[in-house]
Amino acid sequence: MKITVYQKPSCTTCREVYKALEESGVDFTAVDYYVDPLSKHKLEKLLKKMGMKAPELLRKKEEIYKTLGLDKKNLSEEECVDLMVRHPDLIQRPIVEKGQKAILARPAERLKEIL
């Protein structure tokens, strides 16, 4: 079954997951979502496959989170998704998708859950 990793190549955890997949000989596709942005529909599908709500996927320590004053707002599911689509830095990473399941592979050891 095809595996897709949604990542930011400069992210340490993303590089760990990439290396682990390469070393295990697993066939996978890496998607840099800064170059190939996630659509709202795709992000919603990934959230559903992960069993997560959008606020759980927000990177709350990112500068943009504070700059936009998001720490002072009670955001809806749709608002969070829209923000992550517009500002990919707000997306926790890496996300690993395999068939009807996806995980947030943070820490990288979580990768075992999907292989």
Predicted regions and their residues:
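Local sequence-structure signature of Cys/Sec-based thiol-disulfide redox active-site neighborhoods
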Residues: 1-24, 28-33
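Thiol/selenol-based redox catalytic cores and closely related redox-interacting motifs
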Residues: 35-115
